[in-house]
Amino acid sequence: VEVATVKNCGKKLLATPR
């Protein structure tokens, strides 16, 4: 469960334009 959360956060950060 924790791993999935981390992956989701990373994907959101990558998808979000800086």
Curated annotation (Swiss-Prot):
<dbReference type="GO" id="GO:0016853">
    <property type="term" value="F:isomerase activity"/>
</dbReference>
<keyword id="KW-1015">Disulfide bond</keyword>
<comment type="subunit">
    <text>Heterodimer with venom peptide isomerase heavy chain; disulfide-linked.</text>
</comment>
<comment type="function">
    <text>Acts cofactor-independently.</text>
</comment>
<protein>
    <recommendedName>
        <fullName>Venom peptide isomerase light chain</fullName>
    </recommendedName>
</protein>
<keyword id="KW-0964">Secreted</keyword>
<keyword id="KW-0413">Isomerase</keyword>
<dbReference type="GO" id="GO:0005576">
    <property type="term" value="C:extracellular region"/>
</dbReference>
